[in-house]
Amino acid sequence: MSRISLSEPWKKLVWVATTVCNYNCTYCAPNLHDNKNRWPENYYPVIDMINRFRKGDPLIVDITGGEPTLWPEFETFCTDLVDSHKNKTSIQFTSNGSRSVRYWDRFSAPIDEMAFSFHTEYADTEHFYQIAKSLHLRYNTKIFLMMPPNRLTEMREFYDRLEQSDLQIDVATKLIKHHDGTGLVDGYTPEHHDFSVQRINRTKYNKVKTIDTSTVLYNGDKISAQDLINTKQDQFLN
């Protein structure tokens, strides 16, 4: 029998830190931007809870919202969380990228990976390009192009600009799902689906030392977890 184990003993915690958001996207679940749940006034109990959860293991903390960067103490929270434990704490977060370029120029939190969702109902392509330019040499930076059916041309143009740049970023396109989990919204064509599988992969994950969540030990050898899935070697019979 083959033995599969994690290549590093990590855990992952996803935290919806706030439902305060400056966007009101039509396809976003209402409870994620209802502005009812603000960030904690005192975040040290949150750090204590996180460290109890990890039980000494290396930990990935994925922070979402709402919009996390609206929290005035977001950067200091990240710094204090990393400093609170001797083992590795890898912080990731998702943002709509709406803060000013000046904000991102000054951003210095100990983040291992930041993901930006480009929402065509509000976001500006030039602004997004400039924040990617500000961050790509300092952070592992991903951009997800959220593509409603009527924005294919705009998404293609922005994707092409990013692809032709020298920015060390990852870019992927996401088709919009109903927020109640009933599948994709109506209006997508084969052209949309063909475009949605295109990827830009240029971060190389070389800015910081991250916890490796993409590989496992398979009979003692480190291999890609996705390769196991693709070849159905992750499936077992009773």
Language-model segments: which ranges?
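Radical SAM enzyme [4Fe-4S]-AdoMet core and its adjacent flexible, acidic
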Residues: E113-N238
